[in-house]
From Swiss-Prot:
SMART domains: IL4_13
Subunit structure: Interacts with IL13RA2.
Secretion signal span: 1-18
Carbohydrate attachment residues: N38, N48, N56, N71
Alphabetical list of Pfam families matching this protein: IL13 (PF03487)
Major place of residence: secreted
Annotated family: Belongs to the IL-4/IL-13 family.
GO terms under cellular component: cytoplasm; external side of plasma membrane; extracellular space
UniProt record, GO biological process: immune response; inflammatory response; interleukin-13-mediated signaling pathway; macrophage activation; negative regulation of complement-dependent cytotoxicity; negative regulation of endothelial cell apoptotic process; negative regulation of inflammatory response; positive regulation of cold-induced thermogenesis
Gene name of the record: IL13
Name recorded for this polypeptide: Interleukin-13
Keyword Magnesium: no
Length: 131
């Protein structure tokens, strides 16, 4: 009986170790959200109204956003965001390559892209779809 009880306790403990644990949010993703909030709070015209190509944030959002923002020059406000996106982007776009995530016919202001990215990343963070 004692042996049987020991086996049951051991299996219970091992079962607890094998059970799936909750997915913890990426600290980088949380930092990105905080940075995007900081950028959008007091910026009526971010980067002097620079325009960037609109991107499809549902397909490779970090790389697509980075690729769109990488061509913005003389805008220190988004440099930290660019570094964070580089860390989150698993693929490096080739020079001169036109991404499938980018819509070449639509340009939007940098502030609008940042707001769109913030909305999308908040949703990803909220629903736990970490990539």
């Amino acid at each position: 009986m004692a042996l049987w009880l020991t086996v049951v306790i051991a299996l219970t403990c091992l079962g607890g170790l094998a059970s799936p644990s909750p997915v913890t949010p990426s600290p980088t993703l949380k930092e990105l959200i905080e940075e995007l909030v900081n950028i959008t709070q007091n910026q009526a015209s971010l980067c002097n109204g620079s325009m960037v190509w609109s991107v499809n944030l549902t397909a490779g959002m970090y790389c697509a956003a980075l690729e769109s923002l990488i061509n913005v020059s003389d805008c220190s406000a988004i440099q930290r965001t660019q570094r964070m996106l580089k860390a989150l982007c698993s693929q490096k776009p080739a020079a001169g390559q036109i991404s499938s995530e980018r819509s070449r016919d639509t340009k939007i202001e940098v502030i609008q892209l940042v707001k769109n990215l913030l909305t999308y990343v908040r949703g990803v963070y909220r629903h736990g779809n970490f990539r």
